[in-house]
Amino acid sequence: KNMITGATQMDGAILVVSAADGPMPQTREHILLAGQVGVPNIVVFMNKQDQVDDEELLELVELEIRELLSSYDFPGDDIPVTAGSALKAVEQLLSDPNTARGSDEWVDKIHALMDDGDKYIPTPSVKVDKPFLMAVEDVFSITGRGTVATGRIERGLVKVGETVQLVGIADTRETTVTGVEMFQKTLDSGMAGDNVGVLLRGVQKEDIERGMVLAKSGSITPHTEFESEVYVLNK
């Protein structure tokens, strides 16, 4: 459930596979689910390279990963694959936080992975010209301030002081945005693609729950009948 929730919001993903063990059953599931929910781009990191002495074994694991990706309609032959060791990189950075690029083999491999992500996963185009919409993922209260709904803004903009509608499950109601926060920073607004907390006026915690949405007033209506496509993972 949690993997699917996160994957539906992704513009790209890093698939981490142990170079020592190769693809595991959950690797196959993650690739399958990534394809089902529409993750557009994947890059691969073969971790624990420090545990593999045989270069041919490393090549075999890479080949297995590429074949697995291709079997689920990802371009396995074209996807960037980087081998390295996250542990070795972390150990080096803990010993010297100022390690420069080019001065340590393991840290450089993480830089190479980030380069792959920058090149292969394009910067998404954000839908700021459409009406505001955010699915509520979690709700909590801040003493003295009110109720905060958190989630990823799917489209549009939301600004402090705007009136929005709370739609779904319960009756549709209007509320005013009194604050927008992202990563513990207070903002004047949030835009499509941002993961934010939206502070709402006059809404109690019990009035809002996961599954509801915040939207620009009058832009959407709830429905009790709809057509859907369901994929059941059975193996």
UniProtKB/Swiss-Prot annotation:
EC class (word): hydrolase
Descriptive protein name: Elongation factor Tu
UniProt keywords, alphabetically: Cytoplasm, Elongation factor, GTP-binding, Hydrolase, Nucleotide-binding, Protein biosynthesis
Subunit structure: Monomer.
Residues given in the record as GTP binding sites: N47, K48, Q49, D50
Transmembrane segments: none
GO CC entries: cytosol
UniProt keyword annotation of Nucleotide-binding present: yes
Annotated compartments: Cytoplasm
Major localization class: cytoplasm
Function: GTP hydrolase that promotes the GTP-dependent binding of aminoacyl-tRNA to the A-site of ribosomes during protein biosynthesis.
EC id: 3.6.5.3
Similarity field: Belongs to the TRAFAC class translation factor GTPase superfamily. Classic translation factor GTPase family. EF-Tu/EF-1A subfamily.
The reaction(s) this protein catalyses: GTP + H2O = GDP + phosphate + H(+)
Domain tr-type G residue range list: 1-125
Cited Pfam families: GTP_EFTU, GTP_EFTU_D2
